Amino acid sequence: MIASLSGTVEHVALDRAVIAVGGLGVQFSATPQTLSTLHEGRPGAVQTHLVVKEDALTLYGFADRDEREVFEVLITANGVGPRLALAILSVHHPETVRRAVTEEDEKTLTRVPGIGPKMARKIIVELSGRLAPTGEPVPGAEAEASDEPAVETVWHADVVQAMAGLGWSEKEALKAVEATVAARPELDEGRDVAALLRATLRDVGMAGAVRGGR
């Protein structure tokens, strides 16, 4: 099993990266938050989990052991595959996932594309007692997302496409991107696709937390 990677970062995309290890370029999928810690041409390291199927070997990378641990517990739930588990961690911090399961917070889980009320309840029941909160502060926990739309620009399509790859419909993704840009116009001015993707996913998660508490 490949438990971790450490080497020179060769490439970073919106949903994957390549790290050179011993003369080989190893590609892995990861959340935008994890990818934001990697920079091309510089040393980088990730914790990993290898998914073996009959027709493919897929490697997933994580910023730390905690993120990987939550991923590995999530994929043991019936109906939660690696792609959905990665989508959950793209929207929510690992500690938020732990709290949602422990506190039976279905609304937080349903902010993730592909998870409806029934699936959220199923995840909570199956993982009960296996994802205890650590008490770690959740970055950006006090932020709130705006629902006001903004004007679409061509470069937003890259963000929409990346979110579609995580399971959102294009309509849902575009609405989320517009709301984030409306709340923080400076993201639109910077035209940093990765930064906008991370902010949008964070806002999607926080919107669920805010509404769930009402």
Curated annotation (Swiss-Prot):
<comment type="function">
    <text>The RuvA-RuvB-RuvC complex processes Holliday junction (HJ) DNA during genetic recombination and DNA repair, while the RuvA-RuvB complex plays an important role in the rescue of blocked DNA replication forks via replication fork reversal (RFR). RuvA specifically binds to HJ cruciform DNA, conferring on it an open structure. The RuvB hexamer acts as an ATP-dependent pump, pulling dsDNA into and through the RuvAB complex. HJ branch migration allows RuvC to scan DNA until it finds its consensus sequence, where it cleaves and resolves the cruciform DNA.</text>
</comment>
<feature type="region of interest" description="Domain I">
    <location>
        <begin position="1"/>
        <end position="63"/>
    </location>
</feature>
<dbReference type="InterPro" id="IPR036267">
    <property type="entry name" value="RuvA_C_sf"/>
</dbReference>
<feature type="region of interest" description="Domain III">
    <location>
        <begin position="151"/>
        <end position="214"/>
    </location>
</feature>
<dbReference type="Pfam" id="PF07499">
    <property type="entry name" value="RuvA_C"/>
</dbReference>
<dbReference type="GO" id="GO:0006281">
    <property type="term" value="P:DNA repair"/>
</dbReference>
<dbReference type="InterPro" id="IPR013849">
    <property type="entry name" value="DNA_helicase_Holl-junc_RuvA_I"/>
</dbReference>
<dbReference type="GO" id="GO:0009378">
    <property type="term" value="F:four-way junction helicase activity"/>
</dbReference>
<dbReference type="GO" id="GO:0005524">
    <property type="term" value="F:ATP binding"/>
</dbReference>
<dbReference type="GO" id="GO:0006310">
    <property type="term" value="P:DNA recombination"/>
</dbReference>
<keyword id="KW-0233">DNA recombination</keyword>
<dbReference type="InterPro" id="IPR000085">
    <property type="entry name" value="RuvA"/>
</dbReference>
<protein>
    <recommendedName>
        <fullName>Holliday junction branch migration complex subunit RuvA</fullName>
    </recommendedName>
</protein>
<dbReference type="InterPro" id="IPR003583">
    <property type="entry name" value="Hlx-hairpin-Hlx_DNA-bd_motif"/>
</dbReference>
<dbReference type="InterPro" id="IPR010994">
    <property type="entry name" value="RuvA_2-like"/>
</dbReference>
<dbReference type="InterPro" id="IPR012340">
    <property type="entry name" value="NA-bd_OB-fold"/>
</dbReference>
<dbReference type="GO" id="GO:0000400">
    <property type="term" value="F:four-way junction DNA binding"/>
</dbReference>
<comment type="subunit">
    <text>Homotetramer. Forms an RuvA(8)-RuvB(12)-Holliday junction (HJ) complex. HJ DNA is sandwiched between 2 RuvA tetramers; dsDNA enters through RuvA and exits via RuvB. An RuvB hexamer assembles on each DNA strand where it exits the tetramer. Each RuvB hexamer is contacted by two RuvA subunits (via domain III) on 2 adjacent RuvB subunits; this complex drives branch migration. In the full resolvosome a probable DNA-RuvA(4)-RuvB(12)-RuvC(2) complex forms which resolves the HJ.</text>
</comment>
<feature type="region of interest" description="Domain II">
    <location>
        <begin position="64"/>
        <end position="142"/>
    </location>
</feature>
<dbReference type="GO" id="GO:0009379">
    <property type="term" value="C:Holliday junction helicase complex"/>
</dbReference>
<keyword id="KW-0238">DNA-binding</keyword>
<comment type="similarity">
    <text>Belongs to the RuvA family.</text>
</comment>
<dbReference type="InterPro" id="IPR011114">
    <property type="entry name" value="RuvA_C"/>
</dbReference>
<dbReference type="GO" id="GO:0048476">
    <property type="term" value="C:Holliday junction resolvase complex"/>
</dbReference>
<keyword id="KW-0227">DNA damage</keyword>
<dbReference type="GO" id="GO:0005737">
    <property type="term" value="C:cytoplasm"/>
</dbReference>
<feature type="region of interest" description="Flexible linker">
    <location>
        <begin position="143"/>
        <end position="151"/>
    </location>
</feature>
<dbReference type="Pfam" id="PF01330">
    <property type="entry name" value="RuvA_N"/>
</dbReference>
<keyword id="KW-0234">DNA repair</keyword>
<keyword id="KW-0963">Cytoplasm</keyword>
<dbReference type="Pfam" id="PF14520">
    <property type="entry name" value="HHH_5"/>
</dbReference>
